[in-house]
Structure formats: C-alpha cells, structure tokens
A protein has these predicted regions:
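N-terminal hydrophobic/helix-forming segments and targeting peptides
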Residues: 2-26, 40, 44-524
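Short, non-ligating residues that shape and space the ligands of small metal-coordination modules
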Residues: 31-32
Length: 524
C-alpha cells in the first residue's frame, strides 16, 4: 500500500469533496474504488488533500474529525468505525476466545475488541525481540449520555409519551434541557435459526426532548431539578384517553415475558423498521442511548473553532487512533506500537471493558507470549517484567482550555489555549501520572516532532478530574505521562475545541510513536 493510499484511507478523504490532489497522488490513490467524489487537480503538493494528511498538516484533519463525530454518536459506532478503518488498512483481528500462538510475528498489524465498546490496536516492529518495550497511548471513547432503563416504557402523562432513561456519568445536567435528542446504540437480535447477533442503529432525526418549565411559573431551571421526575424526555403524543371511558388496554408486541413488552411500542416499531426486523420478539435486548443531534461544525470569524457534542473524549481518542495509523514502519523498529481506547472512563473504569479491567495488560502479555514462541524464547514473568520496564504510556484525555470569562479560575502559566498544541497535565495528588522523567520524555518528543507543548495543573481550591493513566501505569508498572488536547465546556452536552486541535493531536501522537525509541535510548 502506497503512502498516498494509506493517507487517503486514514482521513476518510473519499467522504469529502471537492478533493484537491496533486498529480502524483491522483495516480496513487484508490479513488476509483470508492463512491464518486469531485476531484480538483493541482500542481502544488501543499494544497493536495492527501499530501496534507501525509505531512500531518493540522488543518487537514478538521473536517474528517467533524464527520467522525457526526457519524459515530455512540461508543458502539465509534468502535465499529475504528474496526472498519483497521480492516481496510490490513490489520488482522485477534479473537479473544482463540489461541494466539503462532499468529503474531514481527512486522504484523493486529487489533482486538472487548464488548464492542473497547478496542486495542498494535503493530509489531520488524526488529522486535521479546522483552522489548511497548510505546502505548490509552484513552477513552465513552461520553456523558442518557441510557434507556431496562424497562423504559412509561405510562402516558397528560397526553405525552415519555421515555425512561438514566444518566450515564454527569448527563441530564442543565445543558441537556431543550435539546434535539436522537437515539442510537446496540440491538441484540435472535433470528429464526436461533443465532444471536448484535446490530448497530441510529436515527437521523430527533425523537426526544427534555422541556424546561417557563419562568412564568416561578420555578428556576438552573440544574437543581430532580433527574428522576423532572428530566424525563418526551417522545410523542397520545390523547386517546380524552373522552374515553375506562383504562386503555396495554399494547404488547410479543409473547408474555418478551423484552419488547417492556419498551415503548412505537419505539420498538421504529427501531425494528430501521433494522428490517419483522418479528418484534426477535429483539432480545438493547443498549440504546440519547444523544444531541446537532452536528459538529466549525465556527468563529475565521473558523477557528469546532462546536460539537461528545468532544470528551472522542477528541483525543480519534487523534490518537489517527496518529497510530499514520505512524511509520521502519526496518529497525524494535518496539510494539499500540493504541488502547476504553469504555466506562466517565464512571470509574471498573467494568471489564474499562481501563481498570485486564484488557490492556492481558493483550500485551498474550502478544508477547505469542511472539516469544515465534522467537523460540521461553515466556514467563521475566519477559513480561522486562517488557513493562522498557515501555511507556501516554494517557490521552482532554483537558481544560482557558475560559476568557473566568480567568481567575486558572493558575498563571497553567492555562492552555486552543489551536496551540498538546497539554502536559500534572496533579500533585496522583490524579495524573506525569512526573519529571515522563515530562522530560514527552517534551523531547515534542521537540523532535515540531510540536508546541502546553502545561496544565488545576488550582489548589478546585477539584481535579482523573484519567485512565494512574490505573494503567500502576497495574503494569510502566513509565507514564498524561497529555491531552484542550476544550471548553467539559461535560456540557455541547463543547468547543480548536479547529486545528484534532490535527495537532494527530501530529503529537504520531510523533510519540515514531520518536519514542530514539528518546528512550537517550535515557539508557
């Protein structure tokens, strides 16, 4: 695969138009195998869409990131996107339930998923030897949302159909009121033969809204409302009770005990139609959630911003993934390059697909075991310990951009700006992994990669958030640092980042994976 073709696939350039190409890339890219696109030819590589991606120009990644946000609203869709991208680039999936012995080799490209909501991808250096280190980036792809309850059907209230939902992490806060909410997620289906499968679904129009109460009623709407009784989404109308006598019969869509009988009938019918399901009882269960439908967009006088939902943390996870895909593969690479994107960070990471589970260490250890067998080297605790001692983790999570309306909330010289670069994040109480050694390592990476690092630490009178870094670095004993991209309005249903920040992230994460072995050698 040529570098031009790789860049074309990485950034989804077949989805955008018009596509400006230099003559060289026009000959190399596989555009003839994609959907029709509008092409503009240029003699200058600096304006060629593919060349801009190949050279990590930040502006080349703005629209691809916005498209990713628009098309992948749930964690299930995000993992599906990453899986599709890896497969198209020749990565081999490693089923967790199978034996990996003999399946891995130096120069190989692999990925493994867990629960359809977490994914780990890695490449093995062509010069890899058992005991060599892993250059890894870890982040999370879950975001604040409102998930349907196990029984989401609710009695009609004053003619309104409502939906039973529960907040995931800090969702249903005041920013969720009066928003156009759609629905998506995973549906478990059993067909006529008894085979069970998982199907992804999302609707492209709003089906729900949480209405505020007008100020005329004298009740404030400043976030002090009851999330169980006052933040219940409305999804339709049913005024059939007007003028009727007696109770309305309960509508059922399946046999007694069917899952679909616990959900709003009209929603079941709608989801079934989207998935082409005729027999509603084939729906065994589902994990659906609400999301803000307003699309990600660029804004500002010179389009300096991205306004979008779910920036925390699709931003760092997408940039890390793209940086990983764009990283170089040289003959003398001796390390494993890896990106791990987890679910459940916003609620503590304690589930098996979260960073506190064994997903990352077990994947690394199984990979090292397979590679040791390939190299005829005995595998055991010694090789595992040596691997971790030679490794480094970048914990990638969004951090707080300085807010011009609240400057006093930030420490001097610790106030990151948008469209500048990656932030090295510190915390004296161990909520971040960064120390003097890891800071020096990443600062050197920035120097070699042409990146501008920023620094963030929260004030002593404010509460620091946490990341997956401490739990992963302590579990494996690896050196680590926290580094993330800045955003405004964290944990709002709609946030802001810089239009160059996705691309600046790609440049940094690619630089870390490409330069880490060189930097690590300077410490030996």
């Amino acid at each position: 695969m040529s570098d031009a073709e790789k860049a074309f696939i990485i950034a989804d350039l077949d989805r955008h138009g018009p596509l400006t190409l230099c003559d060289s890339c026009y000959r190399d890219i596989p555009y003839r195998r994609t959907d029709p696109i509008s092409l503009e030819l240029t003699d200058e590589s600096r304006s060629c869409s593919v060349c801009m991606v190949r050279t990590s120009k930040p502006e080349a990644f703005t629209e691809p990131f916005c498209t990713f946000l628009r098309e992948n609203p749930t964690v299930f869709h995000a993992v599906g996107y990453f899986t599709s991208k890896l497969t198209s680039l020749g990565y081999k999936e490693l089923p967790a339930r199978e034996d990996w012995t003999g399946k891995l080799e130096p120069g190989g490209k692999y990925f493994v998923t867990r629960n359809g909501t977490s994914i780990i991808a890695f490449t093995v250096g062509k010069a890899y030897k058992p005991g060599n280190g892993v250059a890894m980036i870890a982040g999370h792809i879950d975001a604040l949302t409102a998930r349907l309850k196990p029984v989401s059907n609710k009695p009609t209230s004053a003619g309104f159909l409502q939906l039973g939902v529960a907040p995931y992490a800090g969702a249903l806060n005041e920013t969720w009121w009066d928003r156009d909410l759609s629905i998506g997620g995973r549906v478990i289906v059993r067909d006529e033969s008894g085979k069970t499968s998982s199907k992804l679904v999302k609707l492209d129009w709003p089906i729900a809204r949480i209405p505020t109460l007008a100020p005329h009623f004298g009740v404030g709407m400043l976030g002090q409302n009851n999330k169980e009784t006052e933040a219940v989404p409305i999804i339709g109308l049913d005024n059939s009770d007007l003028g009727s006598s007696g109770a309305k019969p309960v509508e059922t869509l399946g046999p007694a005990g069917s899952f679909v009988n616990t959900q709003p009938p009209r929603l079941v019918q709608l989801i079934s139609k989207e998935l082409g399901i005729k027999d509603y009882s084939q729906i065994v269960n589902w994990e659906l959630e609400l999301f803000d439908l307003q699309p990600a967009t660029v804004g500002g006088l010179d389009k300096e911003f991205i306004f979008a939902g779910r920036i925390d943390d699709k931003l760092c996870s997408w940039a890390a993934f793209q940086g990983f895909l764009a990283s170089e593969a040289n003959e003398d690479d001796g390390a494993i390059k890896l990106v791990a994107l987890f679910d459940d960070e916003e609620i503590g990471s304690l589930l098996r697909q979260g960073a506190r589970g064994n997903f990352l260490p077990s994947t690394i250890e199984r990979a090292v075991e397979s590679l040791s067998v390939k190299d005829n080297k005995a595998f055991g605790p010694g090789v595992v310990g040596q691997t971790y001692a030679n490794s480094f983790l970048v914990s990638a999570d969004v951090t707080h951009s300085v807010n011009p309306n609240f400057l006093s909330r930030y420490l001097d010289n610790h106030a990151p700006r948008l469209n500048v670069g990656i932030c090295l994040c510190a915390d004296s109480n161990g909520h971040m992994t960064t120390d003097s050694v890891s800071t020096a390592i990443l600062t050197r990476v920035c120097e070699l990669s042409g990146c501008t690092p920023q620094v963030f630490q929260i004030r002593n009178d404010s509460r620091s958030g946490g990341t997956v870094g401490p739990m992963l670095s302590s579990a494996m004993g690896v050196k680590a640092a926290d580094a993330g991209l800045p955003q405004l309005s964290m944990h709002s249903i709609r946030a802001t980042t810089g239009s160059l920040d996705p691309g600046l992230g790609v440049k940094f994460f690619k630089g870390f994976l490409d330069k880490w072995e060189k930097v690590d050698a300077e410490w030996q």
